[in-house]
Amino acid sequence: MKLLTDWLVLDGCSLAVDDLVAVARGGVPVRLSPASLELVRRSRAFVEALLEGDEIVYGITTGFGYFKNRRIPRSAVEQLQQNLLMSSAAGLGEPFGREVVRAMLLLRANTLAQGYSGVRPETLQLLVAMLNRGVHPVVPCRGSVGASGDLAPLAHLALVLTGEGEAEVGGEVLPGAAALARAGLEPIRLGAKEGLALINGTQAMSALGALTVHRAQRLAKLADLACAMTLEATLGSRSAFLPHFHRLRPHPGQQSSARNLLVLTEDSALIASHAGCDRVQDAYSLRCAPQVHGASLDAISYAAGVIAIEINSVTDNPLIFADTGQVVTGGHFHGQPVAMASDVLAIALAELADISERRTERLVNADYSNGLPMFLTEAGGLHSGYMVAQYTAASLVSENKVLAHPACVDSIPTSAGQEDHVSMGLTAARKAVTVCDNCERVIAIELMCAAQALDLRGKLTPGRGSRVGLEVIRAAVPHLESDRIVSRDIEKVVELMADGHLLEAVEAACGRLD
C-alpha cells in the first residue's frame, strides 16, 4: 500500500500492519490502484468465458462443501451465490467493534485486488466505498472454525453489499439497504463466483491478528519501561543487562530488551546510590527480564511475520489464473498459519503479564522492596494503599493462563466430513485479544505502583526513561496520599498506554526503543 497525498493506494500485495491500523483506527481513505483494477477485469472476463462453456467449476457451476458434485444450471448461478451468503450468515455473539470490521473490509478488498478471485470491478469498488464512507457491517464474533476461512463472519460482512444484513453508519445501526442509501451507495446483485469470493478467506482472524500484533509490539516496550521503573524503585542493579554479558546468548529479543533496560535506566541517581551495597543479585523477575521479555518479543515478531504475509495473500478458493487459463482448487483459506501465530502471540503476552505481576508483588510487599512501606502507603492500617491492585493483577494473570491454552490444536470436522480438519483460527485470534487486554492492565498496574514507589524514594532521580515515564503518569494520576478508587487510576494509565502517549514521550527522551 502506497501513500498518495491523504489516501492509501491498495494494490493487493504491499499492505503493512501500520497501514491497516491507519485505515481501521485512523479512518485513512483507500483507493484501488489502476493496475489492480485491470487484473480484476481480466479475472472476471475469464469467469464470464467459463460460463459460456460447459465446464464444471467448483463454486461457480457446482454447490459447496458436501455438495461439490451437485451441478448448478446456468440460470441459477447468481442465485447460488446469494443463497451462499444467506446460509453462511450463521454467526452469533456480540458484534465486532468498528475498527475490526474496518480491518476486515480492507483485507477483503486487498485480497480481491490481486485479481485471482473472479469478482467484477464494481463489486470490489463497492467494498472500498463502504470502507471510505463508513458503512460498517454488523458482524457477530462467533461462528468461524477457521476453514474454509471465516465463512460466517465474512458472510455477515458481504450481505450488506447486496442490501441485506445490517450495518452501522454514523453510530446508527440500519438494515443493509438503508445503510448503503444513507452513504449514497446502491446494493449490487451478485454475479457468478462472487458470493464465494467474498466469504472464503481468513480476513476476520487476520484483522484481529494484525490489530493485536500492533498492540503487542507496543506492550513489549512498555513492559521494559515498567521493569526499569520497578528496578529503580526497589534499588535493583543494571549489571545483568550489560552488552558483553548478553552477547553470550544472542537471542534477538533478549538483546533488544537488555538494551532498552540500560537506556531507560541511564543516569539513574537511584541506582548509583547503592552501587556499593552488599546485595549480590536481584530476583528473577528483575534480573531475568531480558530473557523473559525477549522470548516474548521474539514470539511477537514471529506472529507479526505471519500476519504480514497473510494480509497480502490470496485466500479464496478456487483461484482464477486468467493468464494461463486455469482454475485451481486448493486450500489457501485454511487458517492454520494465523491460528498458530495467534496462539503463540497469546502465550507471549501472557508471559509478559505473568512476570509483571511478580514485579508488582515486589513493589507492594515490604519484605521484598528494600525499604518501601507495605502496599506503598505511608499510613498503613487506616489506608490499604495498593494492596488490592495486586489482587487484580493476579486475577488477570490467572485468566490469561487459561486463555493461553492453544486453540489451533483442536479440530472438529464439518460439512459431513468433507472439511475434516479446521484451524479454529478465529477462536485463537479472539483469545489473543483478551489476553492482550489483560496484559495491558497488568502492566498498567505495575507502572502505577512503580510511580508511587519512585515518589516514595524521595529526591533521588530515576534514569532518563523512568523519569519521563513517572512524569507522564503523574500528569494523569496523582500520588496516592490516602485511599481512593484505584480502578480509575488503573484505567487512566491504560489510556496513556493505549493511545501511545506514554511510549511516545519516553522515546522522545531516550530515542526509539528496540
UniProtKB/Swiss-Prot annotation:
Subcellular locations according to the entry: Cytoplasm
Gene Ontology terms for molecular function: histidine ammonia-lyase activity
Alphabetized PROSITE patterns for the sequence: PAL_HISTIDASE (PS00488)
Family matches, as CDD domains: PAL-HAL
Family from the record: Belongs to the PAL/histidase family.
EC number, as in UniProt: 4.3.1.3
SUPFAM superfamilies, per database record: L-aspartase-like
Name of the gene this protein is made from: hutH
Cytoplasm found in the keyword field: yes
InterPro entries, per database record: Aromatic_Lyase, Fumarase/histidase_N, HutH, L-Aspartase-like, Phe/His_NH3-lyase_AS
Location of 2,3-didehydroalanine (Ser) modifications: 148
Major location category of this protein: cytoplasm
Lineage: Bacteria, Bacillati, Cyanobacteriota, Cyanophyceae, Gloeobacterales
Catalytic activity, as annotated: L-histidine = trans-urocanate + NH4(+)
Catalytic EC class: lyase
Keywords carried by this UniProt record: Cytoplasm, Histidine metabolism, Lyase
GO process annotations (BP): L-histidine catabolic process; L-histidine catabolic process to glutamate and formamide; L-histidine catabolic process to glutamate and formate
Gene3D superfamilies: Fumarase/aspartase (Central domain) (1.20.200.10), Fumarase/aspartase (N-terminal domain) (1.10.275.10)
Biological source species: Gloeobacter violaceus (strain ATCC 29082 / PCC 7421)
Protein name, as recorded: Histidine ammonia-lyase
Record's GO cellular component terms: cytoplasm
Keyword Cytoplasm: yes
Covalent cross-link 5-imidazolinone (Ala-Gly) as placed by the record, residue numbers: 147-149
Pathway involvement of the protein, from the record: Amino-acid degradation; L-histidine degradation into L-glutamate; N-formimidoyl-L-glutamate from L-histidine: step 1/3
Pfam families linked: Lyase_aromatic (PF00221)
